[in-house]
Amino acid sequence: MAASNQNHLPPGLLESVCTIESNLNPTAIHHHDGNGDSLGICQIKYNTAKSLGFKGTEKDLMDPKTNIKYAAKYLAHQIHRYHGNIQKGLIAYNQGSAKDLTRSKYSDKVIKVYQRRLIACQDYTM
């Protein structure tokens, strides 16, 4: 994914996030009570994307390329915020400004999918 490269994310990490967030469904919407909806393939919130410079509408954010672009920015921001700690960055991506950055089921799921992708890539290149 170009967005991963542009944001210096490890190859396959953002795809693993999207797999857990929406099962790679670009039309996924998860409604939250009073906290904005999570939208699209990466399940990013509209206000989060706006805070990263997004100027479009919620409908525009449903475009997979746009959704991935802003999700990559947000994930990279969270990982950088926690000094390169991928697990803490994943927890913060999922929970917002996370207060408790201990291991979570969410980050464990993403890491497991990510590890499977890495193993599959290694098997393919051998």
Over which residues does each language-model region extend?
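Catalytic glycan-binding domains that act on GlcNAc-containing polysaccharides
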Residues: 1-126
